[in-house]
């Protein structure tokens, strides 16, 4: 196991226009302050205020959006980071681990990773992801590229069908089809930060949001040693070279994770579990009393002094005494949140320290809060009650189905852009309006400028005389559409769908 030295991980250099020379502690901190400014002032963060957390198209400002959720995750991440640093200081290990002059950057990377952790999520959350993947899967059929005879390939894009005698090109076709059918919010976050917004963050800051290490074009089983780290796609084919460079800059082995990402993940797990239940009460899906009974029933028999007693029962009893003349709802969730944080944050911090050799190496194949402990059981309790009583509620499911239909419908509306030949689409990109393509011209005009520029830049770097060129061009054209639609807010996607379907002006 490599020696733990965080100076080798907290890399303050950037992909472009990187600071040069040796830097003092204060100068390094200023570099990460610059990262903070770039992130907080980015439009992707602002758009989170109109993206779904649990309840799509919610008008009640007391119910969480992706932005308010991310701010809460940021605070919990900061709490865990400070707890870790405090414990390492008590153990006199800060200097030994190369952290004595990097405590500020350590905290900042965690905080900003937490704030950014959802920026790649499409409108309508997981149902939006499913809509994008299902739409492309129905047209590309990546499974047919694996074992079917070539004559049975149902891919509707002629250029991406496998062909006899073209094995090198066929392998690229397989990758592209698989990649486009595995849109994922975390992978889109990497693409947003690097390719679409060109934020030019430090290598360490980007490492903090690389939550999953599986390429989106991965086929087959994942290695047992990395099955948790690779349980979802983490980056796309379009960012393959960038991620390879990131691994080099952060001293990460293949499919390994950046150490501080575990803290961001734990902060998210702690935050959303309580928040989803609180939002459900705000939405009147159930009362606080009903929630307490749901939690009590799901936990089962327990003794005094158990974690359930110290966290949930304690919050319930204090809220009923109502000594602060506040509503029982507010009191209960205040105590539940405080009790949960006071138990889970120190536990997560200690798990990080206890497993630091594997975490530093990037190979710890678990979440910090997924083990056989009572703390893990408490999180599972919150999640299970939310799944049973919140996510399955008819109002939530109806809105999710509407969101799925909106995203599928928008992809269908923009499909003519994918149906154009390479030469015709190239002409449209160059001229922006082609008389014989009136519908396609108008659809192209609606695409946002940053997304169009990202497409043009990617295609301009390809050798146009290569046999791979048509495949890559079509890949980036599909990415253009995914980028545009996934970047919409819930409300914009809803309104755009209604306008283009002529439901309203």
Swiss-Prot record:
Keyword Magnesium part of the UniProt annotation:
yes
Instruction: Report the cofactors.
Output: Mg(2+)
SUPFAM superfamilies on file? HD-domain/PDEase-like (SSF109604)
Q: What is its EC number?
A: 3.1.5.1
Q: Specify the domain of life of the species encoding this protein.
A: Bacteria
Q: Which PROSITE patterns match?
A: HD
User: Which Pfam families does the entry mention?
Assistant: HD
- Where's the HD domain? 66-273
Q: Which reaction does it catalyse?
A: dGTP + H2O = 2'-deoxyguanosine + triphosphate + H(+)
Single GO BP term: dGTP catabolic process
Q: Which UniProt keywords apply?
A: Hydrolase, Magnesium
**InterPro entries named among the record's database cross-references:** dGTP_triP_hydro_central_sf, dGTPase, dGTPase-like, dNTPase_1, HD/PDEase_dom, HD_domain
Q: Which CDD domains match?
A: HDc
A molecular function annotated in GO for this UniProt entry is:
magnesium ion binding
Q: How does it assemble?
A: Homotetramer.
The family database entries (NCBIfam families) matched by this protein are listed as:
dGTP_triPase, PRK04926.1
Summary of the function given for this chain in its UniProt record = dGTPase preferentially hydrolyzes dGTP over the other canonical NTPs.
Give the family per the record: Belongs to the dGTPase family. Type 1 subfamily.
Please identify the protein, giving its name as recorded: Deoxyguanosinetriphosphate triphosphohydrolase
- Organism in which the protein naturally occurs: Escherichia fergusonii (strain ATCC 35469 / DSM 13698 / CCUG 18766 / IAM 14443 / JCM 21226 / LMG 7866 / NBRC 102419 / NCTC 12128 / CDC 0568-73)
